Amino acid sequence: MTIGSKFSLLAGTRKTDGPTEISASSPPDVETPSAEKTATASAGNKEVGINDNSSDEALPSQHVQTGVQKIQAVTLVWSKWSLVAVFCLLWLVTLANGFRQSILYSLTPYATSSFQSHSLLTVINIVSSAMVSALYIPVAKVVDVWGRAEGWLVMVGLSTLGLIMMAASKNLETYCAADVFYSVGFAGMNYILCVLAADITNLRNRGIAFAFTSSPYMITAFAGSKAAEKFLVNVNWRWGFGAFAIIFPFVASPVYFVLKVGLNRAEKQGIIQPRLRSGRTLSQNFKYYFFAFDIPGVILLAGGLTVFLLPFTLATRAPNGWKSDYIIAMIVTGFVVMVLFVLYQAYWAPQPFLKYEFLTNRTVLGACLIDATYQMSYYCWNSYFNSFLQVVCNLPVAEAGYVGSTFQVVSGVLLFMVGFAIRKTGYFRWLLFIGVPLYIFAQGLMIHFRQPNQYIGYIVMCEIFISIGGSIFVLLQQLAVLVAVDHQYVAAALAVLFISGGIGGAVGNAISGAIWTNTFLPALMRNLPESAKANAVAIYGDLRVQLSYPVNSPERIAIQESYGYAQARMLAAGTGLMALMFIWMFMVKNYNVKNMSQTKGMVF
């Protein structure tokens, strides 16, 4: 993958294939597409849905990565029905993924509780988020160096392996290791799905395409929660994971075969040449891919982020709290390793992942900061939300899942509206001026309503408002990074965005874990009746123990009050962080996507 030279800070240096610049004749803060994009779009401006650009250029772009050439070759040879088939397959994958998310979201607290580790939910999330964030680097390079199909197949394999390991895990250590494979696999699949959506759509229609592939979540939000309850009642949580280890490979594999069939057809027609053997030996191949996939960068980022963030959750368990030697050592070591990652990318990496153009483009930076802040704020309070609904609101598993899935239902409808609004107006930044204030308002309201004895309808109302704002963020931040780069950098730009979100999620989980461990257990010790205080640690670590106390019993009321005390502080932290959005949203330039196109061939 040609990812660019090391960071250049020389005055006046700018690569010609980087992000577009504002034209001198353009209105203030309105982005004009580059000459290359305008030329590509000249025939595409007439599109009204599926658009055939193959007459513009009959061959894939030259001087781009192999993976980009492959997908352009596929779109140049396939028919309208092949395009429709891919969209349908991606819809089915999203449907299965939605069921997986909805079911396992409800089962995860019971899985960790079976190891008496319910309070370690955030620790597991921190480790998996850090690993996922780092591994977007090699995944982006795999889809650019090898191809989209090959990257998809690898991610399907990793996610299936993770599900099998989780279903068979007998202790927390195995479960945590499985969660890394599971999280990396499914995060990688979601990432490649976004890359594929960018490959087969025009910028003008990308919002509609994103809405279509996200629409299955409206179905799975309710059906999945009920299925999770049935797993717990009739079988066990392990079969919830095991079932998807069987289902998912069958649903996801056809995407790989459709892409490979299209590539074979392109090779037979001479549109792209088959890949020749490199002639490298096994050891030379290992060395080449070790640096091409930036494995040193992965190790530095994942290790540094994990070691730095874990102490914020583990400090209360340490013998001397924050004064413990290993807690201080972890924070210092993690920080130093993350600094080394930045220096490595800047000066020593043979093929650096972080491009200079990305780091100096205000739209890319703004979108990444929006995603990081949104994820940080969201994960400040979300990890224990499902448990809160069951323990404090006294909802059964299915109904708690319904409330927790509000985002999926709302986004399924709202994304279509946002997508059509962008197609009609050509602009998207104005939507941030609606989403940001609404999200902060709703999350602020939730501080008041996330307490015992509150009507559940108020919580659902806040969730709906939060979902409206969140849906806008999810779509616009992707669109913002894509309009700022050419097609050959789509995978890399999206990876930078996903890394930002992953780091934000890891930091949010660290904040959540720190607040939880420093508030919930002390609150239990204050609120529990004397007869139950000896059981405080068991209550703290096991959701099933919390639910075992009858509703309205002194013990249950004490647990509910402790939840309310902790949750209010989690939400306050998340709401305070969201204030940064008022700065980040002004960093995004006001692009007009009506006259922009990055793709070739038969696209939507």
From Swiss-Prot:
Keywords: Ion transport, Iron, Iron transport, Membrane, Transmembrane, Transmembrane helix, Transport. It is a multi-pass membrane protein. The keyword Transport applies. GO terms for biological process: cellular response to iron ion starvation; ferric triacetylfusarinine C import into cell; transmembrane transport. The chain crosses the membrane at residues 73-95, 115-137, 149-168, 178-200, 207-224, 237-259, 289-311, 326-343, 363-385, 400-422, 427-449, 454-476, 489-511, 566-588. Residues 1-61 are annotated as: Disordered. GO terms for cellular component: plasma membrane. Coiled coil: none annotated. Pfam families: MFS_1. The keyword RNA-binding does not apply. It comes from the Eukaryota. InterPro entries: MFS, MFS_dom, MFS_trans_sf. It is found in: Membrane. GO terms for molecular function: transmembrane transporter activity. Involved in the transport of siderophore triacestylfusarinine C and so has a role in iron homeostasis. Belongs to the major facilitator superfamily. This is Siderophore iron transporter mirB. It comes from Emericella nidulans (strain FGSC A4 / ATCC 38163 / CBS 112.46 / NRRL 194 / M139). The gene is mirB.
